[in-house]
């Protein structure tokens, strides 16, 4: 099995992106499975192009994207990506689409086909806060999750794809005392637990992780 795991570069005025830094700390293998790590730009459409170029070089079984969700206190596997870009801030090349469709011939949404509940529970089993999220926002994180679903539906039917959001790291909140953070090492452990859950079984578990609102 070959796994591609991606992390975004810093955006929104931040000096670091904990998603990328945690991805860099992951090993090159998990068991007998090869892990390739890829930095992608926080730029609408270009982020997809960088991943697609890598997917054309190698035959991947799993593509897992990691992104920063400043303000969340837990690791949050994402359930679904939706077909809209609605950017509150500009991306790293100044693009700020508002209410734009990502793919005109795509579905309204694509659900991750990774075992998202198994992943969530595996992270919690390490003593790390985790929650199954039902919204990846409408910025570049949702954009890339949706694009992965579109690629799976139209060109790469065998891949498993998904997305995990991670919190700020402590150095990012020295001027944001109201924002939660998590150490980079804890994020790394959580992501490794997620990868272990993914390679252990493609089947999800039946457990109540839904939300009332």
Swiss-Prot record:
SUPFAM superfamilies recorded: Pyrrolidone carboxyl peptidase (pyroglutamate aminopeptidase)
Subcellular location(s) of the protein: Cytoplasm
Highest taxon, organism lineage: Bacteria
This protein's UniProt keywords: Cytoplasm, Hydrolase, Protease, Thiol protease
Cross-referenced CDD domains: Peptidase_C15
GO biological process: proteolysis
Gene3D superfamilies: Peptidase C15, pyroglutamyl peptidase I-like (3.40.630.20)
One MF annotation (Gene Ontology) recorded for this entry: pyroglutamyl-peptidase activity
E.C. code: 3.4.19.3
InterPro entries with a match to the protein in the record: Peptidase_C15, Peptidase_C15-like, Peptidase_C15-like_sf, PGP-I_bact-type, PGPEP1_Cys_AS, PGPEP1_Glu_AS
Role played: Removes 5-oxoproline from various penultimate amino acid residues except L-proline.
Protein name: Pyrrolidone-carboxylate peptidase
Native source species: Staphylococcus saprophyticus subsp. saprophyticus (strain ATCC 15305 / DSM 20229 / NCIMB 8711 / NCTC 7292 / S-41)
